Each structure stands twice: as structure tokens, then as C-alpha cells.
């Protein structure tokens, strides 16, 4: 399910990935969209096609699979640019990335506790692949998008590539990092 909000001239969309309760955020303006921490969503893809979106910028708060699992999906449907902190990008392009042990462990433990089958369902839809990131940064990156300033700041802790994404000095996306 997509939740819509409006931030001035930008359509702001939030979606929770049903398998792992991970948030994806989308900023939509004209024929461009910014997706933060993507997961596969046919509903979002249909909306982006309906809005004639041609280009998608993918920003990652960090490199863990619950925040990157939809990259391939949007690459298949749109012209994409992936932006990630350098350490996260290096990990996503390594063979180690092909072993999502922590995520599968957590889902398995939740299944035991809750009597659910989320891990089994997740494995049916999860596509495991390495990614080459288009734009990396060491400590900070600023970019202008649709009259808005996007700032990415490296804050290692949760992962080596963890970053804050700040929009117009007003909105902060932390991924799994705590402030």
C-alpha cells in the first residue's frame, strides 16, 4: 500500500515492505522520481508509469538487503542512477553481498516466534544479485533535484556505508541508524 503526502511541489510516497517491515520513500516531480531504500512494488511502478516517469534516482541509506531489494526491479523498468556511500557500494559489488545471512536469520527467528512463514514467502520473491553503484561518495554528497537540495552524509555505525539523507534541511531519512 502506498501512502501519499505532499511537500510543496513534490508528491511524497511511503511504502512498507511487507516481508521485512522496511520503509521505502519516493519523491515524485514531473518525469523524475527519487526512491530511497527501494523494494519491489508493482503498485508504485504502475503509478510511476502513469505519471510518465522516465528517470529514477535511487538513494540508499545503507547497503543491507532489506533496503536494497528492489533495485533490480526499478532498473528493469526505468533509467536509473544508484547513489550510495563508497563502503556500501563496494560491499554491494562483492561476492559477500550474495549471502544475506542476517536478514534470513531474522526472518527465520520471527517465523518461529510468530508461527508465520515470512522467510519462505520472502525467498520466493527476493532476487539476489550484486550491484554496481553509479555515484559514490566518501563523506558527503550534495545534489539538486527538482528545486530541492538533497544531502547525503556518511554516518558509519549500523553498517560501514550508513548515511543520512537530508532534504532541504527539513526531512531526514536515517535508514536503520539512530540519531
Give the positions of each predicted feature.
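Catalytic core of the metallo-beta-lactamase
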Residues: 1-55, 76, 123-179
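Active-site HxH/HxHxD metal-binding segment of metal-dependent hydrolases
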Residues: 40-41, 45-144
Amino acid at each position: 500500500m502506498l501512502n501519499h503526502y505532499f511537500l510543496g511541489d513534490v508528491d511524497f510516497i511511503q511504502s512498507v515492505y511487507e516481508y521485512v517491515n522496511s520503509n521505502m520513500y519516493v519523491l515524485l516531480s514531473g518525469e523524475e522520481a527519487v526512491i530511497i531504500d527501494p523494494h519491489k512494488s508493482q503498485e508504485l511502478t504502475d503509478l510511476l508509469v502513469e505519471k510518465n516517469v522516465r528517470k529514477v534516482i535511487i538513494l540508499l541509506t545503507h547497503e543491507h538487503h532489506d533496503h536494497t531489494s528492489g533495485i533490480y526491479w526499478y532498473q528493469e523498468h526505468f533509467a536509473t542512477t544508484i547513489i550510495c556511500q563508497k563502503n556500501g557500494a563496494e560491499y554491494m559489488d562483492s561476492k559477500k553481498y550474495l549471502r544475506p545471512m542476517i536478514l534470513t536469520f531474522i526472518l527465520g527467528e520471527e517465523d518461529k516466534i510468530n508461527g508465520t512463514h515470512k522467510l519462505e514467502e520472502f525467498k520466493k520473491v527476493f532476487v539476489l544479485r550484486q550491484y554496481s553503484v553509479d555515484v559514490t561518495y566518501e563523506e558527503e554528497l550534495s545534489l539538486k533535484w527538482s528545486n530541492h537540495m538533497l544531502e547525503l552524509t556518511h554516518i558509519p555505525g549500523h553498517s560501514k556505508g550508513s548515511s543520512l539523507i537530508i532534504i532541504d534541511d527539513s526531512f531526514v531519512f536515517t535508514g536503520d541508524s539512530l540519531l
